[in-house]
């Protein structure tokens, strides 16, 4: 029975999501809220924690693999390896800390550098701690302007109230899925082109 269960899980499509952002912005809190419906306020700084969950995305059962990375500068070197394995990124900052918003540009540059060979990288900007509106330091218009400049979606979340938590993970998975479908289509197109070319050559030889 267990073997069948593992077999079924391994056959599911897997979407790999990387949590990126400065320390203390709530990356771990968002991840744990999505995974377990729990709000964890006091959390030890993360080096890298990995989570996997089976979800239903637009009627299809899939698996999401979430890697929660460290925001501290000490871990900048090892982040490259994590970024290489990722298929999509949630770039998180706290609306109560403008410095964390400014830092998103540097994190994005690191992602683009590591993923230089890829055309469009699935990425969302996430303004967390929307429940602390009275302490807001990042105007919504400023964050939206940055998202528009980068050609990505901007969503505000609260790991505490669970506002938009599911939305950011599911929206990112949809972007990852679209990219995979596009890449598969391109690959199949190239294979088809090669087959036709080979067929023509054989015809000429005959």
Swiss-Prot record:
Chief localisation class: membrane
Lipidation, S-geranylgeranyl cysteine type: 203
Region (Disordered): 180-206
EC annotation from Swiss-Prot or TrEMBL: 3.6.5.2
Compositional bias of kind Basic residues: 190-200
Keywords assigned: Cell membrane, GTP-binding, Hydrolase, Lipoprotein, Membrane, Methylation, Nucleotide-binding, Prenylation
Membrane topology annotation: Lipid-anchor
GO CC term (a single one): membrane
Family indicated by similarity: Belongs to the small GTPase superfamily. Ras family.
Protein name: Ras-related protein ralB-A
């Amino acid at each position: 029975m267990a073997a069948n269960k593992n077999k079924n899980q391994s056959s599911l499509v897997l979407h790999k999501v990387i949590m990126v952002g400065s320390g203390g912005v709530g990356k771990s809190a968002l991840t744990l809220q999505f995974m377990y419906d729990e709000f964890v306020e006091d959390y030890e700084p993360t080096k890298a924690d990995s989570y996997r969950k089976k979800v239903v995305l637009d009627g299809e059962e899939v698996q999401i693999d979430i890697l929660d990375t460290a925001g501290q500068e000490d871990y900048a070197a090892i982040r490259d390896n994590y970024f290489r394995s990722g298929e999509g990124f949630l770039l998180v900052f706290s609306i109560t800390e403008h410095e964390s918003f400014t830092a998103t540009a540097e994190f994005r540059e690191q992602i683009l550098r590591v993923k230089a060979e890829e055309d469009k990288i699935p990425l969302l900007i996430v303004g967390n701690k929307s429940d602390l509106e009275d302490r807001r330091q990042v105007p919504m218009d400023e964050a939206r302007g940055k998202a528009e400049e980068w050609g990505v979606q901007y969503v505000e979340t609260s790991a505490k109230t669970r506002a938009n938590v599911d939305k950011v993970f599911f929206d990112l998975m949809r972007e990852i899925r679209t990219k995979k479908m596009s890449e598969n289509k391109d690959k199949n197109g190239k294979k088809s082109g090669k087959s036709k070319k080979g067929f023509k050559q054989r015809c000429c030889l005959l």
